[in-house]
């Protein structure tokens, strides 16, 4: 049982570090109101998690990669906070684009990941 917690924890720490690195890189390249870093992370995360759940990985790999790594990599809470910040700035065009594209592209990416993993 302890090994399961270690797998999830180690995977999550790696995923969070990758998310942080991508976020720093993207924010340094594109100065815009649209949260491209979080958008990219969540869309690629949707694809990768879709792929992972549709493959025949063993339960330990699922814990490490699916629950751990992907849980640390993707960020639903940052998506919500950035959405609220756009609302508070009254930047409704970017807000609705961000929310709509995140959900639509996330579903499409997850579907493609699942189809490729089958």
Swiss-Prot record:
Activity control summary: Na(+) is not transported, but it plays an essential structural role and its presence is essential for fluoride channel function.
TM annotation in the entry: 5-25, 39-59, 61-81, 98-118
Record-listed Na(+) binding positions: 71, 74
Top-level taxon of origin: Bacteria
Record Pfam families: CRCB
Keywords, in A-Z order: Cell membrane, Ion channel, Ion transport, Membrane, Metal-binding, Sodium, Transmembrane, Transmembrane helix, Transport
MF terms in GO: fluoride channel activity; metal ion binding
GO process annotations (BP): cellular detoxification of fluoride
Membrane topology annotation: Multi-pass membrane protein
Reaction catalyzed: fluoride(in) = fluoride(out)
Record carries keyword Transmembrane helix: yes
Entry GO CC: plasma membrane
Cystine residue pairs: none
InterPro entries: FluC
Compartment(s): Cell membrane
Entry similarity comment: Belongs to the fluoride channel Fluc/FEX (TC 1.A.43) family.
Task of the protein: Fluoride-specific ion channel. Important for reducing fluoride concentration in the cell, thus reducing its toxicity.
Protein's name according to its UniProt entry: Fluoride-specific ion channel FluC 1
Source organism of this protein record: Listeria innocua serovar 6a (strain ATCC BAA-680 / CLIP 11262)
Gene: fluC1
